[in-house]
Amino acid sequence: MKKVLLFAAIIICIRADEICIGYLSNNSTEKVDTIIESNVTVTSSVELVENEYTGSFCSIDGKAPISLGDCSFAGWILGNPMCDDLIGKTSWSYIVENQS
């Protein structure tokens, strides 16, 4: 059993340097409004790696991200015709939304 746990710990440490984007979070009493709920208690987050576009996005576990382009997340979910080219997308690792 100890060997299995040691092996699992080694694998986790080996994969730990493969972070593409990430956030550091800690406990907080901050409340925010989300699309579906109001006054949700969340952890505060600090952007760790990416704060500007470098020309390419990392795939995570072999899945490419989905870039919304000129479409907003809300427009994509609500069916804005501007987002029609995203209809066939069924699998992605994370969502990239451009600031506008």
UniProtKB/Swiss-Prot annotation:
GO cellular component: a single term? virion membrane
Modifications the protein undergoes after translation, according to the UniProt entry: In natural infection, inactive HA is matured into HA1 and HA2 outside the cell by one or more trypsin-like, arginine-specific endoprotease secreted by the bronchial epithelial cells. One identified protease that may be involved in this process is secreted in lungs by club cells. Palmitoylated.
List, in alphabetical order, the Gene Ontology terms for molecular function in this entry. host cell surface receptor binding
Which BP terms does GO give this entry?
A: clathrin-dependent endocytosis of virus by host cell; fusion of virus membrane with host endosome membrane; fusion of virus membrane with host plasma membrane; virion attachment to host cell
Q: One Pfam annotation, family name? A: Hemagglutinin
InterPro entries reported for this sequence: Capsid_hemagglutn, Hemagglutn_HA1_a/b_dom_sf, Hemagglutn_influenz_A, Hemagglutn_influenz_A/B
Q: Where in the cell is it found?
A: Virion membrane; Host apical cell membrane
Which Gene3D superfamilies does the entry link to?
Answer: 3.90.209.20, Hemagglutinin Chain A, Domain 2 (2.10.77.10)
Q: Coiled coil where? A: none
Q: Which UniProt keywords apply?
A: Clathrin- and caveolin-independent endocytosis of virus by host, Clathrin-mediated endocytosis of virus by host, Disulfide bond, Fusion of virus membrane with host endosomal membrane, Fusion of virus membrane with host membrane, Glycoprotein, Hemagglutinin, Host cell membrane, Host membrane, Host-virus interaction, Lipoprotein, Membrane, Palmitate, Signal, Transmembrane, Viral attachment to host cell, Viral envelope protein, Viral penetration into host cytoplasm, Virion, Virus endocytosis by host, Virus entry into host cell
Residues annotated as glycosylated are N26, N27, N39
Tell me the leader sequence span: 1-16
Membrane topology term: Single-pass type I membrane protein
According to the record's subunit comment, the protein's assembly and interactions are: Homotrimer of disulfide-linked HA1-HA2.
Q: Which protein family is named in the record?
A: Belongs to the influenza viruses hemagglutinin family.
Q: What more does the record tell us? A: Major glycoprotein, comprises over 80% of the envelope proteins present in virus particle. The extent of infection into host organism is determined by HA. Influenza viruses bud from the apical surface of polarized epithelial cells (e.g. bronchial epithelial cells) into lumen of lungs and are therefore usually pneumotropic. The reason is that HA is cleaved by tryptase clara which is restricted to lungs. However, HAs of H5 and H7 pantropic avian viruses subtypes can be cleaved by furin and subtilisin-type enzymes, allowing the virus to grow in other organs than lungs.
Role = Binds to sialic acid-containing receptors on the cell surface, bringing about the attachment of the virus particle to the cell. This attachment induces virion internalization of about two third of the virus particles through clathrin-dependent endocytosis and about one third through a clathrin- and caveolin-independent pathway. Plays a major role in the determination of host range restriction and virulence. Class I viral fusion protein.
Q: What name is this protein filed under?
A: Hemagglutinin
Organism expressing this protein natively:
Influenza A virus (strain A/Duck/Memphis/546/1976 H11N9)
